[in-house]
Amino acid sequence: MTNEEFRRDILAGIPDNLPEPREYDRSVNHAPRRKDILSEAEKELALKNALRYFPEHQHSTLAPEFARELREYGRIYMYRLRPDYPMYARPIGEYPAKCKQAAAIMAMIQNNLDPRVAQHPHELITYGGNGAVFQNWAQYRLTMKYLATMTEQQTLVMYSGHPLGLFPSHKDAPRVIVTNGMVIPNYSSQDNWERFNALGVSQYGQMTAGSYMYIGPQGIVHGTTITVMNAARKQLKARGIEPSRENMGGMLFVSAGLGGMSGAQPKAGVISGVVSVIAEINPLAARKRYDQGWVDELHDDLDELIPRIRKACRDKEAVSLAYQGNVVDLWERLAAEDIKVDLGSDQTSLHNPWAGGYYPVGYSYEESREMMAAEPERFRECVRASLRRHAAAIGRLADRGMYFFDYGNAFLLEASRAGADVLAADGKFRYPSYVQDIMGPMFFDSGFGPFRWVCMSQDPSDLALTDEIAANVLKEIRAEAPEEIRGQMDDNIHWIEEASRNNLVVGSQARILYADCEGRTKIALEFNKAIREGRLKAPVVLGRDHHDVSGTDSPYRETSNIYDGSAFTADMAVQNVIGDSFRGATWVSLHNGGGVGWGEVINGGFGMVIDGSEDADRHISEMLLWDVNNGIARRSWARNEAAVKAIRREMERTPLLQVTLPNEADNSLIKKALEHKD
């Protein structure tokens, strides 16, 4: 297809003449058949809802087709409307658009649906089993047409994948406002999601899937590397060993998942210098990560894998080994063998336990997919039984000294609900969340989080230049940084200097870098200067994961190290999106769910297109200050020591910033007051 044909296809939106039906492509990884949850009346409503995108004369053709999709897949994806052109992020100039901001958003959307990047591209699922960009292909086509025709005096409003329309606004307003899964809190159960999604009225956007900010497994690999490295350091310190990279050699890290997010684990293990063994039940997902170079070896026989693990640990190899099979089989075999596991975690998609996020032991991948749709209650019982075995094997290894941490995927939450042995005597989880032990106190509380950028030229040389700019900025900041954050600065400088060697790019020319407010702002301003001077060939999109300092309220993950009782509140995430929207964000998003699951999390994010202009300089300075320090202020009010120090530093740097700081009360005074009775 020529670029001119591509542009015409975008501008056509939903075509007047329906394209021919598409064959179901079995070479692509597809979403599992969803639960048959709708009543007959609701199925009629779902069909009626789907047909409202099309003129009446097409209904007789589409109605039986959509009814068949609903019956066979549990959803109406409108496969017929899937475009013929290849799906990938193109250079910004190839998109038909009246403003650069809209063209950049189009590239970001297409990257989320790129088959190299997306988990279930034909079902518009980017990662996590149900992290959707859109609910159907009509929504995609209509959204792309709106973006192609909008001006800087309009804002596109997106309701859970549905483009509500273009509304008059102004140049400084966001070009797109996204919400995903914003249901009334009392209607936020797993079954509610299944029902609303099948009706076509809501979707689970995960984090960066529904907000057009996913950059492949690289998007989480820096955070995963930080976590694995610091978990290894904790283990070495506990053993009285110097926590050096050299001493990490031969340590064994075991986990599960080679999907869109979890696929970062083997690469993070190699970068950290440890031996990593990652289980993945889906053969297509395991092969995809192997073919992309994100895992070194692929094994499907535990009798062969176990001696390979022994050799890798003995020889202190920095190597990643994938086990294509059920993770419970792996854990139980490791527990039965005399193998020392140093670090353990889990990244199965347990936010979505009943619809493809977790596969029970004792059943093949295909058997499980059939059971979850045909016998959902039996499938639930099998998952619960599997989780009990899963946790028991982990417990045996933890008793031998393994450091296990929950990676915020609802593993401990769902295991506890299944009756697994994961609770301590006080009723709290036996194992920490990685945010409680590592990410929260060491990074989020000090303002460090997953800043990212995407070069809209899609030119690797532009990405290389941004790496160089970012490294130079961080070195300058490091020279004046206080002692308490120099360790983080050193790790981040090492990361960005090694980024190109680690072959992280899958899809668009993007980079992830943990940075604080000062680092993000100064890096972004230098990027904008480079665009202005012509050293960068095209605009750059700035963004971040929602899994950040301010972006997410999640009591079992991002805010699990908040101990003042406010971990279950969501003011921070909601306020963050509102504040970003009027400080210069090009688009903002607010989601229910993400990470731990639907009904368990509120999170949000932004995207900002910088083009070398003075307006972009202003937006960078105003918006990034708020986007980071909102969360630091909240964390400092929760009496988190590092956050109090960080917000004090920011107030010294920014005279207009005035934050309410906590006063500490003496514990003995509190106890005495409560003991006194009138």
Language model segments and positions:
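Solvent-exposed alpha-helices and their adjacent loops that cap or buttress functional pockets
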Residues: 150-151, 167-171, 176, 186-187, ...
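Long, compositionally biased, glycine/small-hydrophobic-enriched stretches that function as flexible linkers
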Residues: 1-196, 202-210, 376-526, 530-543, ...
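Small-residue-enriched alpha-helical segments and adjacent helix-cap loops
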Residues: 540, 544-575
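Residue-level detector of anion-binding/catalytic polar loops
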Residues: 275, 340, 403
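Active-site/ligand-binding-proximal alpha/beta "capping" segment
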Residues: 320-348, 355
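Glycine-rich beta-alpha junction loops
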Residues: 283, 325-328, 347-352, 408-414, ...
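Active-site-proximal segments of catalytic enzyme domains
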Residues: 196-201, 224-238, 555-556
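Catalytic or ion-translocation cores adjacent to nucleophile or general acid/base/metal-coordination motifs
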Residues: 205-226, 233, 242-244, 249-252, ...
